[in-house]
Amino acid sequence: MNFDFSEEQQMVRDSIARFVQDDYDWDTRKAIVASGEGMSRDNWQLFAELGWLSIPFAEEHGGFGGNIVDLSVVMEELGKGLVVEPYFATVVLFGGLIKRAGSEAQQAEWLPRICLLYTSPSPRD
């Protein structure tokens, strides 16, 4: 049995690791936490543009159709960087709930919004 990450998983892992290393140092993180929102909208937008928000969702909803391993790659790298943006709450918890228990109408309404980041001015609203 092969437990190596796929090429796509390695690319995602490397892109998140590079983001954390180059753009998410301790002082940046402290400034984000101290801000009024407690997160960076610019970073959240970047996550959407890079496809990180859409990894676990079906292609029909704007996602990549990823699986739990794909999601764990993202969570591991974000965790290593102590990234404070609400990936877990938004994508894993809320998105996962809608994906697994939502009606077709709810999935069609909410999952593309998570993938493409257009629910509201702030992802926590």
Predicted feature residues:
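Short secondary-structure capping/junction motifs at helix and strand boundaries
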Residues: 104-111, 120
